[in-house]
Amino acid sequence: MNLFGKKEEEVEGEVKKKGLTNTLGIDLGTLNTVVAKPSGDKFDLYKIPSVVAVKKEDPTYVLAVGEEAKAMLGRTPEDIIAVRPLKKGVIESISQAEALLVYAMDKGSNDAIDSIDRIVVGIPGDASEVEKRAVEDIGKKAGANYVLVISEGLSAAIGAGLPIAEAEGTMVIDLGAGSSDIVVISLGGITDIETIRNGGDDIDKNIVDKVKELYKVEIGIHEAEKAKINVGMVHSSATIEPTKTAAIGKSMETNKPKKVEIDSKLVADAAEPIVVRLIEALALVLERMSPELISGVYNKTVVVGGTSQLKGLKERIYEEVGVPVEISDDPMTVVAKGAAIVAAEPRALEPEVRLKAMK
């Protein structure tokens, strides 16, 4: 089963023919965890907030996971805390991450978690061996017989149907909530990778800080995230109509509720430090890249992840580093889909399979 250099619909068809329905691909993210399960000629997809509610006195005692736990963020009684098991793409709490993964696998298997043979989990490209083993151990504790961790960038390339087996090269820019990966792929393997431990979460926090500074109003992180989604943009030469959105917070002067208007320029200002770091990382990758690979990635670079939806981003990248990029049509799920494809074909990443894929 050759999965490399095929379009997404062709890959899905091969998964269907093999009947590999007891496998899951998981994008274990800082903000959201996405599960992809082959179903017929497509994928069943499940998006789960990466939030766990636990007892304050015993953080290993899990009370809720996912949407229910997310609703508790900032609203819990004194004896309960709602937390994110991952920070900057790295597991902060083994027990809480295990609860999240069990919940995700349960969703993906329609409550038949014991039937899962294999899961493949996408994680940041610069994860240490200790971090990789932690994810593998958690997956096995959660009930999977076989667990493989792969770079989110490589997984995204596979999920997007990029021709990763070709020698010319492709590049994926994966902009997550906690971290961002820039991955260069040739002959089915990673030739270079640069990870920055910044992402959409940092933009949200910067929005909160800027609203405090400008309006003397404290808004919650959810309001900041909504503003980013509604009017998000980055500074670029692109012609973008300025827009505004309302947010409700607490006046720092009166402690009363107060509505403020957040405009797209404020979001662009909040995003600027993260965009600058991304551009610097891209410049480093291009500096290390051979002329042969540069000619390949020039027309085969895709941007995925939630932050890719900021207007003006593709124009800004081209202005700064001279590489035209395409924003994925399905930026939030390609990592999970790619992981599901690898789960359906465990040998897909072995060198001899990569070489065979070229013939």
Stretches found by the model and what they are:
Residues 1-172, 185-301, 308-335, 340-359:
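Nucleotide/phosphate-binding catalytic cleft detector across ATP-hydrolyzing
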